[in-house]
């Protein structure tokens, strides 16, 4: 946290993207059909936003007493990405043609980027990954908690997961940038040792890279 604070690194790009108006009820109806009534979203404003998705607090009717979140793919993402993909591939093709470049395969690089980005917008794939990561850490240690993803309420456009109380690393860093004692703040809020937690997360991520079949490969501050 102190390293980020000292660098003056901007964090708003990680988890403070502008909110896009989404008709959540309509998305649920389209994605879940008759099961849509099982998801009750708390309010119409997301509590977290990203470049591809917005996240809302919600309740699941057939699982009373627990708190959940629903991650919804921004409707504009697919629309704009399809246009961007065509433009990117054309520019790479034109560049490769004009430069007569056979060493640096621009079109192949563009195709790989497009394939990877499409995977990022498919929450069925993310569901499989989330379940695999949860199972790995459940077998390995009780020091890392991964939320459960509800497969019966998840589709290509939405994910429903249980809500785990905590502090995002971005908030901790912002407090450090303001000159606050972040270690004491985390201890007061959660009763935990931030330094030990960061060491645990860092070491477990490194071990997972070597041992796990599937890893979470995007541990930026907005995701921790």
Regions found by a protein language model. Give the residues of each.
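Broad phosphate/nucleotide-binding scaffolds in NTP-utilizing and phosphate-metabolizing enzymes
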Residues: 1-208, 213
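Histidine-centered phosphotransfer motif of kinases
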Residues: 216
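Hydrophobic residue at the +6 position relative to the catalytic HRD Asp in the kinase catalytic loop
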Residues: 219-224
